[in-house]
């Protein structure tokens, strides 16, 4: 049964991945929204931190707007969330069936946009159901306690049991769908071409870091909602700090994004999550919400600089790794990423202009190809079971044949144009 649903999901992703490129504006919007959703862990929405800083209050109001369904009461948001979730599942089934039997294209186009934006709306959809599931475990059946988040529901009453069951189903569907989308539906194309502006921001060779971040965010969200009392502030602060630190370390180790800007922003996002945990601990220990709140936002540029320095340090370390130090498939690909980055930096010196093929450009490209081929050959020989390495190898040799074919054509053209001696 599990394999059947996995096959259907892969089929849906395959028909929707005809174009995985994403506008940089959309990438920036999505990154900003998900960052605000992480910052909201420090708001009063889950655990009371009682902000007194005006700047913090404004930011948290914006974070509230993008993290939960706005302009709706708690119970209305619950109904909207369940309806959207079930509607998306029904539309996905309709898309797959209409394409399979009638080759309809329009549903695929719409489904592609839903898959792109689903990671952004995951928090607003799942939070109402986690609130329904988790918030009554602190109370007994005999207490007849009003639900902490839904005033018209009594904990462990018959109505609560029905909503509880529905929320279990919807939350499970949302979590599994989000995990599959993050793990399978992403731009895995390696960068190519001399136009650096055309390189995708979101391209990456693996989704392991994104999947890890998703799992940690979901666990933190469950704990924040389940432990919504002030006594949890220290524990949740430490857990948030460790989660962000682990996410940043994993990003820097794997370096999954081909574009430095994307890697920098996601590393900054992970450090911000870690700093959110530190601020929660300081706010609780010092009992100073105004001063600590200002410190939280003052440190944001420092975190960005720290992310940039950490990324540059990691790039330098990877560049200095010898062949015997490449002890796993991930390090093999990070080494290849370093070679590609060196070549694209060489191209960057000419600016964002059209570059004619020249002997210098051909020499640099062939040098990069040679280094990548040698590294791939050694990697496949030492780590034959690494999936990401096999996927990249297939893409590399498919892409490599295109510039080499153009070079051969150009050389033959030059030979024909030369006078006979």
Where in this protein do the model-derived segments appear?
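Short interface patches used for recognition in eukaryotic signaling and trafficking proteins
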Residues: 113-120, 357-360, 395
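A general structural-boundary detector
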Residues: 120, 142, 202, 255, ...
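Extramembranous, membrane-proximal N-terminal regions and early juxtamembrane loops
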Residues: 1-245, 260, 264-267, 271-306, ...
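Solvent-exposed, well-ordered amphipathic alpha-helical segments
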Residues: 197-203, 207, 365, 394, ...
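Alpha-helical transmembrane segments
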Residues: 249-263
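N-terminal alpha-helical interaction modules that lie
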Residues: 298-384, 388, 392, 398-421
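General secondary-structure edge motif
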Residues: 113, 195, 248, 359-360, ...
